[in-house]
Amino acid sequence: MARVLEVQGVSKRFLGLQALKGVSLGLEEGEILAVIGPNGAGKSTLLNVISGLLRPDSGRVLLLGEDVTHLPPEARTHRGLGRAFQIVEPLPELSVRENLLVGALFGKPRTSKREAEAWVDRVLELTGLAPRAEAL
């Protein structure tokens, strides 16, 4: 299997606090990784570095072999890398359908709008939300 995500020797400090020190990990295609630990262990910092919300002080983040360490979050998202926050909330200015479409379009690389819309329609039917699809 191909290595999809690789974190190489990532470190991050906040003033005098060492949040991450030499963190390395790799994910193969289809693999799932759980990051667990107590409050303050650096879990959110690691996810923020991987997703581009924070820049590491040292180390690299590779996506499908490409170094994305210095790319902004939106460029990483367009390459298929994003994150969900602990409290997931829909975008309030978008309808139910549009919120699902955001995930369908940007959650998978190279998904056409037609494929994404078909997926959204299936999800709306499966969840019973089709009657509320256009609600904000």
Describe these PLM feature segments.
Residues E93-A104:
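Short coil-to-helix segment of the ABC ATPase nucleotide-binding domain corresponding to the Q-loop/switch region
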Residues I36-P38:
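The feature captures the beta-strand-to-loop junction immediately N-terminal to the Walker
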Residues R60-L62, E66:
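ATP-binding/catalytic-site motifs of ATP-hydrolyzing domains
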Residues S51:
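Helix-to-loop junction immediately C-terminal to a conserved catalytic motif
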Residues R55, D67-I87, R110-R114:
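ABC ATPase NBD coupling module
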Residues K113-R132:
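Conserved ABC ATPase "signature" region
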